[in-house]
Every structure is written in C-alpha cells, then in structure tokens.
C-alpha cells in the first residue's frame, strides 16, 4: 500500500504476489453495499430531500423499534417538506421497496464475494482464508434483519464451497455511525483469532 496526496492506492502486481505468498488471508467486504443502495434510492424518491432523515437512520440515533423511534421517523418525514408524491415514494421504499433493494444487493454482494474467493483460490490454493460474516447496522429495520441473516447464510455456504473458514460476528458492538466500536473491533478480532489454524 502506498499513498499519494493522502489517498491510499494499491499496486496490483505487488498485492497479487503478497496474496499468492500468504499463509492467512482474511476477508471482510460488502458491508456497506446495501446501506449505500438504500441511501441512493431514498434520495431519488424524495428528490434529494431525504438526507435529513437518513442521517438519524444511519448514525444510530434510531437503533430500536420503539415509540421514540417511530416518533422520530414521523417527525423526520414531516420536517422534510415532501410533496405528496415524494412522501408516498419514501413510505413505499421504507415498507416494501427496501426488500427489493436488499434482495438485489444481496445477490450482487454474494456474486462479488464468490468472484473474489475464486481469484484468491487461483492465486493461492493453500492459504487459510477466513471469510468474516456481517452484523446488522440498522437493527430496528426488520427488512435488514432478514437481509443480513440471508446474506450470512449465503456467504457461509460460499466459504464451505471454496475451503474457507467462515467467522460469524452477530454480537458486534456498533457505534452511532453504524461501524464497530473499539469493543466491537476487539470482538471481531477475537472471533477471527479463534478461527486461525495453528
């Protein structure tokens, strides 16, 4: 890895050689794919007005499905000054449209992970590959719970298919921005270390 103007970049031939020579490869990818698709869809549905609503959704202000969360969501929608069409589109997205986005994104994420596992195995058939699963960054959204359960099931099957070790991380402690806390990172590290072959 090198940097140019503070931006990290990778020299692909060097990276490929390092992967070919590695004894252990850990892989944790695709976690943001669904969140980014949801943000884009909500922005399109509300002509860009939904940013004010997405911030509390994605920063963890609304972590649980309770009265306070529903009131915050309702107030957030009211404060967006949406047209009736935009409100209808936003509510449809939060109701049933998100499931379609999750299904499409999950299929693409699984395909991407499979392609990466194929390439890693071609480069290094003998390395231990540890494929880390996913935690749910938005636990109050039932669609996301289903999405991440199915995604973990699919990725675990891929790990078995390509001779990788799957590591589950469902109890990751999450910060307000949806990313693991320091304790969450330590938990993930402990789960990975348990899977490392001696």
Residue ranges and their predicted role:
Residues 1-99, 103-104:
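Conserved SGNH/GDSL esterase-like catalytic core that processes O-acyl groups on lipids
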Residues 17-21, 123, 160-161:
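Extracellular/periplasmic catalytic domains that process cell-envelope and extracellular macromolecules
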Residues 23, 156, 176-198:
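Histidine-centered active-site loop/cap adjacent to the catalytic His
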Residues 23-28, 128-133, 165-168:
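Structural recognition of the beta-strand scaffold that forms the well-ordered cores
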Residues 90-110, 138-144, 176-177:
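Surface-exposed cleft-lining segments at the edges of enzyme active sites
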Residues 113-117, 152:
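Generic structural signal for well-ordered alpha-helices
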Residues 117-124:
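Surface-exposed amphipathic alpha-helices with a cationic face
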Residues 136-169:
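Substrate-gating cap/lid alpha-helix
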């Amino acid at each position: 890895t090198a940097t140019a103007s503070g931006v990290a970049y990778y020299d692909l031939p060097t990276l490929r050689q390092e992967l070919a020579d590695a004894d252990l490869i850990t892989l944790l990818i695709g976690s943001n794919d669904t969140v980014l698709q949801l943000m884009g869809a909500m922005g399109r549905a509300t002509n860009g007005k939904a940013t004010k609503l997405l911030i509390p959704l994605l920063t963890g202000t609304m972590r649980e499905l309770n009265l306070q969360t529903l009131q915050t969501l309702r107030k957030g929608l009211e404060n967006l000054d949406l047209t009736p069409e935009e409100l209808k589109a936003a509510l449809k997205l939060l109701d049933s449209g998100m499931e379609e986005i999750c299904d499409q994104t999950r299929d693409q994420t699984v395909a991407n992970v499979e392609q990466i596992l194929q390439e890693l195995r071609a480069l290094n058939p003998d390395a231990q590959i540890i494929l880390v699963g996913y935690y749910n960054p938005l636990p109050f959204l039932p669609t996301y719970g289903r999405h991440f359960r199915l995604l973990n099931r699919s990725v675990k099957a891929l790990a078995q298919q390509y001779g990788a070790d799957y590591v589950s991380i469902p109890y990751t402690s999450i910060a307000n921005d949806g990313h693991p806390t320091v304790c969450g990172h330590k938990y993930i590290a402990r789960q990975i270390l348990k899977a490392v072959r001696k």
